[in-house]
Amino acid sequence: AIGYAAEANIPFELGIIRNHYVGRTFIEPTDQIRHLGVKLKHNANQRLIKGKRVVLVDDSIVRGTTSTKIVEMVRSAGAKEVHMRIASPPTTHSCFYGVDTPEREQLLAANNDTSEMAELIGVDSLSFVTVDGLYRAMGESRRNSNAPQYCDACFTGEYPLSLADRDTNGLPAQLSLLNEKIG
């Protein structure tokens, strides 16, 4: 957020106070727990927000639960406009390599384009970093599509290893020893 404010030449203020003792809400098992987690984790500073055009910056949008609740909170605090900027590309595919993301059909970006996501979340505008922009931020000139420098499957759907227990859409598939080739 500090970097975005500096590049956009707009003031940076702590309009949302974050409780650092609450963990990542997107990995919680139920909507009810995720919603409670968002309420416990974030509080709006109405004195700084009321009557202003606000730009929220977040690392990602997974289901959209946190984004939606934060936008509602900021609007309730009196924001005139709410815009959101995301520091990663849209998460369109599940991660099967250690990040506890939901099934693909639960990912907001898997089923909606950016304008639909903006409407669902309740923001006036929504923008994401592109895949190449993410690579530039990590010091690369761009993504090498023949041999990606990093795992970016959650953004591109191009998994570095085949998923033996998933079909081509990332849905659970029945494993079969009959399909396995023996060396």
Describe every region a protein language model picked out:
Residues 1-183:
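PRPP-associated nucleotide enzymes
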